[in-house]
Regions:
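Surface-exposed, glycine-biased beta-strand/turn segments
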Residues: 1-57, 87, 121
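Short acidic/polar mixed-charge low-complexity motifs
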Residues: 36, 65-68, 117-119
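Short hydrophobic beta/alpha edge segments that flank linear recognition/processing sites
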Residues: 30, 58-61, 86-100
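Short polar/acidic secondary-structure junctions
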Residues: 35-36, 51-52, 96-99, 113-115
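Zn2+-dependent peptidoglycan hydrolase active-site motif and core
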Residues: 23-26, 40-78, 99, 103-109
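Acidic, glycine-rich catalytic/binding loops that coordinate metals and/or anionic ligands
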Residues: 31, 80-89, 109-130
C-alpha cells in the first residue's frame, strides 16, 4: 500500500464523469490526511520526480517486475530521479498539487514497461482493492 492507515477509494480506475464530461481515469484516487507519508509499495528505481501541471508533484518508480508505479498530487517529494528505493521507503507526503486535484489525496497508477507510455493497468487490482 502506498501509505499507512485507512484507505478509501474516492475515484476508481476506469471511465467516470468529471465536470460533466466522460473521462478515463488512468489510476485510482486514495483519500488520506494531508501530509501523510507516501511510501513505495515495491523496490525500484525513481525514473521521474518533479512537477507537472495536471498532477502537480509526482514520482515514477520503475520496478524489477517491468512496471512503473505513478504517484501524483504530492505536497513534497523526498526522492530524486536515479535513486533506488526499497519497499516501504518514504517518497514524499500527500498533498493537493496540480490542476486536476480536488483536495488532499494520492492518485496512484500502474503502467506496463518503463515510464507512462505503456499500457495502463488497473491500480485497484494491483493494490488488492477489488
Amino acid at each position: 500500500m502506498p501509505f499507512r492507515g485507512r484507505v478509501r477509494v474516492t475515484s476508481p480506475f476506469g471511465w467516470r464523469m468529471l465536470n460533466g464530461a466522460k473521462d478515463f481515469h488512468n489510476g485510482v484516487d486514495l483519500v488520506g490526511v494531508y501530509s501523510t507519508d507516501i511510501v513505495s509499495p515495491l523496490d525500484g528505481t525513481v525514473i521521474m520526480a518533479g512537477y507537472g501541471t495536471e498532477c502537480g508533484n509526482q514520482i515514477q518508480v520503475y520496478t524489477r517486475f517491468g512496471r512503473t508505479l505513478f504517484f501524483c498530487h504530492m505536497k513534497t517529494l523526498s526522492v530524486r530521479a536515479g535513486e533506488t528505493v526499497i519497499q516501504g521507503q518514504k517518497l514524499g507526503v500527500m498533498g493537493a498539487t496540480g490542476t486536476k486535484c480536488f483536495g488532499a489525496h494520492l492518485h496512484f497508477g500502474v503502467y506496463e514497461g518503463k515510464g507512462r507510455s505503456g499500457k495502463v493497468l488497473d491500480a485497484e487490482k494491483f493494490l488488492n482493492l477489488k
